[in-house]
């Protein structure tokens, strides 16, 4: 027992004297390692009489516990001192710029849709939506599109079967909205549409915004005034607008709308016209009592003109170098 107390005292002194983790580990090996002093005491138990081994073993294990606790406490103290010394030695350069958190931005097409919705919303137009998989009635028949019209061929339209297709315009939303309500109507219908075309100015999927106003005594002059104000608002300057006679199955009379660019050339931006009486009849509205106008615009087309982009496909290639310009 006396010998164990001496070992504990010696170990405690060595532990307190250790000035580094390396020195402390050397003390651990000296007393607790395979050839350590306390390990040797355990190995010598076999030499004792059987009646003394149990008590002696308990005392040796108790001594090991005391030494282990002392080593653990000293290790914590040395680690804390080492950390404090490291922190004291290090300096923080407060002039170093922080890491910039990069903000995202809206896609230019989304920006354009929101701008259109805001303008027409201030004029009292609601925003309506409809399915992108459309049936022939809502996509063609109700819009006065003849059975032999080229748009009904698979050269222009993505068909699932003869009666179901990816919608080629958001005009079907106009039909559904009128089917489910009663005049007057005043709404726009933004959304994705699909046509079988792909080049510098066309993609198989693009965005359209169509609008409609149906009420008593609606006339073409009102349509012209609204679209002129819209285009000036959209381009944020007074623009020269031209209405050219055109043909659409669902409007009569019909017109295409151009704006004069800075180079003096006319650029087509949208189509419009007075709602054809057959369209009103297809949804149960009396064309003798009600009239209306409709218009439609390609969102990407307007976005290209507003931001000076000359290739429509850039909007869908997800090139961050391109998209970051619109933050």
Curated annotation (Swiss-Prot):
Keywords: Aminoacyl-tRNA synthetase, ATP-binding, Cytoplasm, Ligase, Magnesium, Metal-binding, Nucleotide-binding, Protein biosynthesis
Binding residues for Mg(2+): 252
GO MF, one example: tRNA binding
Catalytic activity: tRNA(Phe) + L-phenylalanine + ATP = L-phenylalanyl-tRNA(Phe) + AMP + diphosphate + H(+)
EC number: 6.1.1.20
GO cellular component, one term: cytoplasm
GO terms of biological process kind: phenylalanyl-tRNA aminoacylation
Subunit text: Tetramer of two alpha and two beta subunits.
PANTHER family noted in UniProt: PHENYLALANINE--TRNA LIGASE, MITOCHONDRIAL (PTHR11538:SF41), PHENYLALANYL-TRNA SYNTHETASE (PTHR11538)
Record protein name field: Phenylalanine--tRNA ligase alpha subunit
Organism of derivation: Vibrio parahaemolyticus serotype O3:K6 (strain RIMD 2210633)
Organismal lineage: Bacteria, Pseudomonadati, Pseudomonadota, Gammaproteobacteria, Vibrionales
């Amino acid at each position: 027992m006396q010998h164990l107390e001496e070992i504990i005292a010696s170990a405690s002194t060595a532990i307190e004297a250790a000035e580094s983790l390396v020195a402390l580990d050397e003390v651990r090996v000296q007393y607790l390692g395979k050839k350590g002093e306390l390990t040797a005491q355990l190995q010598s138990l076999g030499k004792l009489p059987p009646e003394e081994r149990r008590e002696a073993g308990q005392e040796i294990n108790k001594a090991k516990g005391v030494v282990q606790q002392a080593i653990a406490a000293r290790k914590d103290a040395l680690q804390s001192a080492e950390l404090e010394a490291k922190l004291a030695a290090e300096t923080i350069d407060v002039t170093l710029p922080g890491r910039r958190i990069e903000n995202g931005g809206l896609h230019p097409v989304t920006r354009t849709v929101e701008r259109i919705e805001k303008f027409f919303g201030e004029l009292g137009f609601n925003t309506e939506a409809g399915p992108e998989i459309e049936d022939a009635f809502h996509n063609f028949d109700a819009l006065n599109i003849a059975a032999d019209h080229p748009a009904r061929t698979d050269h222009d339209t993505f068909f699932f079967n003869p009666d179901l297709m990816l919608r080629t315009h958001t005009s079907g939303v106009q039909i559904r909205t009128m089917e489910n309500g009663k005049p007057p109507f005043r709404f726009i219908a933004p959304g994705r549409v699909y046509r079988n075309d792909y080049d510098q100015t066309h993609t198989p999927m693009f965005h359209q915004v169509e609008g409609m106003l149906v009420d008593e005594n609606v006339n073409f002059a009102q349509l012209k005034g609204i679209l002129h104000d819209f285009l000036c608002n959209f381009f944020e300057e007074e623009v020269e607008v031209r209405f050219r006679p055109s043909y659409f199955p669902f409007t009569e009379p019909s017109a295409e709308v151009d704006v004069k660019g800075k180079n003096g050339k006319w650029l087509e931006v949208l189509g419009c016209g007075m709602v054809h009486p057959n369209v009103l009849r297809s949804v149960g509205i009396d064309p003798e009592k009600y009239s209306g106008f409709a218009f439609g615009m390609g969102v990407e087309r307007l976005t290209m003109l507003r931001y000076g982009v000359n290739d429509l496909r850039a909007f869908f290639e997800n090139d961050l170098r391109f998209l970051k310009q619109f933050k």
